[in-house]
Amino acid sequence: MDSKLRTPNSELRTLWEQDPKRTTLPLTLDEVLSQVQSYISRKVLFWGERAGEISSYVAGWLAGKGITVIVLDGANRFDPYTVSSLARRAWIPPERLLKSIRIARAFTCYQMATLMGERLVSLVHARAVGAIHESLLQKPWVILLGPLTTFLDEDVSEREVRPLFERSLRKIEGMASEGVPFLLFQSNPPHPPLRKGEEGRFMSSKRVYLMKRLFQFSNLVWRISLDEELQIVLEKGLTEKYQMTSTQSQISSS
């Protein structure tokens, strides 16, 4: 089974078949995931275009490796059909991969904070116990899809969002320190509507704050771009020691 999932890049391209110009990666997804797997402290962010589709593919790819996956979906973008399609192309029964993936969805920032806090602890424990006979050392991998999306709700003030988001990050940090790997997938957050007065500035401030914190929190940051072709580019790694990247500077000045 492993040999059929060793080069996911060719399979991932089917997501972009409608555009023949977008068919190559300067660094293959397989190479990216191999780096992620060998990284000790795994809080890895993939951000940019089509993050939801790529996260669905990665969940199936990990499940195909025999890894238990938990998906917390705050963007309502996880697609089980992508997993099924990957399984069929690898000659694996789709049910086998789907059974290894547990999905929990959130539609408000309060629900997302609960998932990232108390709920995730119980999910990881339950999945670890269920997989104990398969691997005594293997911990479930957690995919956070759209970790910022619900927190960008215009109806929730920045004063409420900041402590809620910070508590959620502390929960994730604690679990990551215990060896639970986290992959975060965030599409480009929408720019605030152009408005006159304080409300427009308020939304811009919240968006900048959330993006900055997500970048600072993540050990590795990969940017997904579809300008000319599909690209996955490393923007932050070990040597940067949590410093803000040039992309973060661009965000803060926008």
Where would I find each of the regions flagged by the language model?
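Phosphate-binding/switch region of NTP-binding enzymes
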Residues: 166, 172-191, 199-254
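Structural motif
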Residues: 45, 141-145, 183
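Conserved inter-motif catalytic segment of the P-loop NTP-binding fold
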Residues: 74-154
